[in-house]
A protein has these predicted regions:
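Active-site-proximal beta-strand/loop segments in catalytic clefts of secreted hydrolases
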Residues: 1-3, 58-61, 86-89, 112-114
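C-terminal "exit" segments of structured domains
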Residues: 109-160
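Von Willebrand factor
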Residues: 1-12, 16-58, 62-65, 89-99
Length: 160
C-alpha cells in the first residue's frame, strides 16, 4: 500500500486467507500523491523472481506521469501479468489512465461503488478465480454471478 508523504510498503506474499484479510483490513486512506509507479516497479521486480498471475489495484486518482506508467504496464503485459484496476469514484483522469493501464497489461478495468463492499468482494473473487483457473474459470464465475463481475469479465475478454 502507499499513502501519506511517499510512504510505500509491500506485505510479504501469503497463501493464507487470514493473513491477507489482516493486511487488507489494516489499510487506511491517507492524503498524498499517488504512487502507482512504485506499485508497478515492485510488481515488475517480483514477477522477474517468480510467476505472478495478476496485479490488483484499487484507487481513486492518478497523479503521475502516465507515459512512465504505461511503459511499465506494457512490460507487465509482456511478462504475462494482467492488471485488474478497480476505480473508486469517478475521476475522469484516473479512469482514462486506469483503462489504458489495463489494456496495455492485457488486464481489465472496472469502476465500483465505494458504498458496496459486496461489489468489491465479487471483483476480488473474480481475480482470484482467474489467477487459479484462467479465462475459462472466470467466464464460468461471471455467468453465475452476473452484475459487476460480468462487466469486468467482458472488458477482460473482449478487447478492441
Amino acid at each position: 500500500h502507499y499513502g501519506g508523504f511517499m510512504e510505500f510498503a509491500a506485505t510479504p506474499w501469503t497463501s493464507s486467507a487470514r493473513d491477507l484479510l489482516h493486511y487488507m483490513t489494516a489499510i487506511r486512506c491517507h492524503a498524498g500523491q499517488t504512487q502507482i509507479g512504485q506499485v508497478l516497479k515492485h510488481a515488475l521486480a517480483e514477477s522477474r523472481r517468480a510467476r505472478i498471475h495478476a496485479l490488483v489495484f484499487v484507487g481513486d486518482a492518478m497523479e503521475e506521469d502516465p507515459d512512465a506508467l504505461y511503459k511499465m504496464a506494457g512490460e507487465l503485459g509482456i511478462l504475462g501479468v494482467p492488471m485488474f484496476l478497480f476505480q473508486d469514484g469517478s475521476d475522469p483522469v484516473a479512469e482514462g489512465a486506469f483503462r489504458r493501464l489495463a489494456g496495455l497489461s492485457h488486464g481489465a478495468y472496472c469502476r465500483f461503488d465505494s458504498s458496496s463492499a459486496e461489489q468489491l468482494r465479487d471483483l476480488m473473487c473474480a481475480v482470484a478465480i482467474f489467477a487459479v483457473g484462467g479465462h475459462a474459470a472466470l467466464e464460468d464465475f461471471s455467468r453465475r454471478r452476473g452484475g459487476t463481475v460480468r462487466r469486468l469479465t467482458h472488458t477482460f475478454t473482449h478487447k478492441p
